[in-house]
Amino acid sequence: MDDNTAPKKNSEKKARVFDLQAMFAQTISNAPRTEEPTHVPQSVSVSSKSESGVSSSAVSDDEDDFMPDLPPGFQMQQSEAGPSSSRAEGPEDSDDSDFDETEAISIIKLIPAACEAKISHGTQAISALRVEPPGVRFASGGLDYYVKLFDFQKMDMSMRYDKELLPAESHVINSLAFSPNGETLVVASGEAIIRLLDRAGKQWSETVRGDQYIIDLNITKGHTATVNCVEFNPLNKNEFISCSDDGSLRLWNLDDHKVITKCINKHRKVIKTKGANGKRVSPQVCTFSPDGKWIAAGCDDGSVQAWKYGSQYVNVNYLVRKAHNGSITSIAFSPDSKRLLSRGFDDTLKMWSLDNPKEPLLVKTGLENAFKSTDCGFSPRAEVVFTGTSSPNKDTPGTLQFFDPMTFDLVYKIDYPGISCHRIQWHPRLNQIIAGLSDGTIHVYYDQTMSQRGVMSCVTKPLKRNRASEVVREDMVLSPLSLEMFQPRGEEGEEKEVTGWRIKKYLRMQDNKLRPEFRKPADMPINGKSANGRVAASGGSLHSYLAKQIGTARNAEFLKDTDVRASILKHAKDAEENPLYIDKAYRKTQPKKIFQETAVEPEDQDDEELQPVFKMPRTK
């Protein structure tokens, strides 16, 4: 290989130079244009879609159909396009038709009140009503102190309750609340203790009662007065809030339950409600917002107060001081947590915006209210606002009214002659309305097309009849004495006639055969130092070894002596030479021992025995 053909050294090579601008321009020119689908005609642009009212959700649904880009100039055949081709040719027309169909649905058709089922709780008014979030059960409480659990899966056409409970003895049930998973039922009554029940209706915990002699509400561990309302956090199944006449709202957590005391020993947070003069006011109702960011309370002075969840709860974040002229009976958030409904004793229903607490958005007057538990609320999608009215006399019926949330115009009404309607629940999953009345009955409204499960499975379930009294049974005569085993066999005298004696004798014989005499088996031999609590030999355990060393081996010689006097006298010489106690003290002062012979001569000269000094008679 010559020098001309030899490879060049690295030092002689030149670095390559890249033109970034040219490369970027070439990349842009070669990149595929994906702004518009190639199978959509050019006449339909993005601007036309926005003008026609196509929502972002519709565009996102089309983008979910993943397919490669088609080559330019490609046209689909009419047979291949199918029904989707008409959609591509005129999206504006299809969207307009869908919009018109939505507008055609009236608000009345959104209320599931085509059918009705009637359930009896008792003879007293319904004071509490709540459906669990899964929609399998619901609970009702009344002025008769009872809580009744209704299970849709177990009920038939009789509409009978599943369980009847008396959780608070002689206290009125004020409020009920189910946990988001339906495992726990919280009962608020006329006492200061909140009861927690499981699915079977058994109480597994309760809250501690506070000290009513302590003024500071932060120091007391629990409520000191009647609990008016309880509500679970929609985002936390272990947290719930309660309000009481002691002027406080308290946050509790199920994780604080103590197994030993079977009690929640202390609250997590305390929220104080104060009036315009700074004094304590009693909250009557409390609730969480659906997104869990707000806690609201309605007080007996007519004020609506709300706090942001997780704050210090010192200052109120939302306050309407004169929301109503009387006590507030119910408050409810809208599904978007931006509006608030309030119902008061001033016979009004008001809607508030969380952005503007000065003036209500809408006001509805003339709604009779005679119960402190009259509910109000939104439908699951906020198309309707509902509330109940009371019946002041037999001529004026109580009603369940539905209003337009934009104007508060009455769109639907259900009358109850001479009966008040105050407890109302609209379950979002079942799409059924449950109303509690003042006569102790519960009315469930549903629609066969819009509603699902719930009471619909009960109205079609046949009623089971009690047939115990209709069964014809064959009577049997039992005469055991006629059997051969009880016949007399060679007995003489009265034994032939005493039949009871023969029965007892036979039973004793059978009993002895069935129960043989118990014999304790012999112990198995021990292989080792110990087994089954037994020691093989003395000294096999630490206790035996110590006892042997301290007691037996040390006193072996002493135990051998049978003559006690001789064993003591053998130490006499040593004690005389080396005294330890008394003799050592008298060695110098009294070297010669002098013993007392007698104190006083006895009167009886014949008695030569000496008597103790303390027994000698006194001499004159």
UniProtKB/Swiss-Prot annotation:
Segments of this protein annotated with the region Disordered: 28-99, 593-620
Segments of skewed composition (Low complexity): 43-59
GO aspect biological process, one term: establishment of mitotic spindle orientation
Short name of any one Pfam family annotated for the protein: WD40
Protein purpose: Required for initiation of gastrulation.
Entry's family note: Belongs to the WD repeat GAD-1 family.
Descriptive protein name: Gastrulation defective protein 1
Organism: Caenorhabditis elegans
Source lineage: Eukaryota, Metazoa, Ecdysozoa, Nematoda, Chromadorea
Gene name for this UniProt entry: gad-1
